[in-house]
């Protein structure tokens, strides 16, 4: 598989959740970081699937190697659904409720649209997060 094919699969899938991958300014499909622009650089070659990151100060983040296409796509989708669901959670904040409740709910909804394997894997990731950092709901202040 080529980097171009990887991008096309991600682009096509993400259209189903209303995301235009060309508008995401922190994900690139290229083997080399362009001018050290901050973001994640995904690429594929005959040996597998990879991601190299560039930090906001130009620091190169070590390369990740994925076992297969599904792992690479999950990494992409996990990040993009974070962006979308965080925006959703901010706009739909409920006083006294941990903001992660609507974020995780929206994120799982998006992953479900992308496919059951991504949804199930996302559920496991969220369970790990909540095991170490449970929801912190508070009572709204009474006036």
Regions found by a protein language model. Give the residues of each.
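N-terminal "first-domain core" detector
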Residues: 1-41
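Intrinsically disordered, low-complexity, charge-dense segments enriched in Lys/Arg
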Residues: 11, 86-143
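Short aromatic-glycine-(Arg/Gly/Cys) micro-motifs in beta-strand/loop hairpins
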Residues: 31-61
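Short coil/turn segments at secondary-structure boundaries
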Residues: 60-64, 68
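Amphipathic alpha-helical interaction segments
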Residues: 62, 79-87
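A short, charged, amphipathic alpha-helix used as a generic interaction element across diverse proteins
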Residues: 67-80
């Amino acid at each position: 598989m080529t980097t171009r094919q990887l991008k096309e699969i991600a682009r096509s899938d993400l259209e189903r959740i209303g995301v235009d991958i060309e508008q995401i300014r922190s994900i690139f499909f290229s083997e080399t970081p362009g001018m050290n622009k901050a973001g994640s650089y995904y690429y594929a070659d005959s040996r597998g699937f990879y991601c190299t990151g560039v930090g906001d100060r130009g620091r190169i983040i070590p390369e990740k190697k994925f076992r297969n296409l599904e792992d690479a796509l999950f990494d992409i989708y996990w990040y993009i659904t974070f962006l979308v669901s965080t925006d959703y959670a901010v706009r739909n904040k409920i006083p006294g409720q941990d903001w992660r409740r609507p974020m995780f709910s929206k994120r799982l909804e998006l992953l479900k649209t992308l496919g059951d394997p991504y949804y199930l894997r996302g559920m496991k990731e969220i369970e790990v997060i909540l095991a170490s950092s449970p929801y912190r709901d508070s009572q709204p202040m009474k006036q």
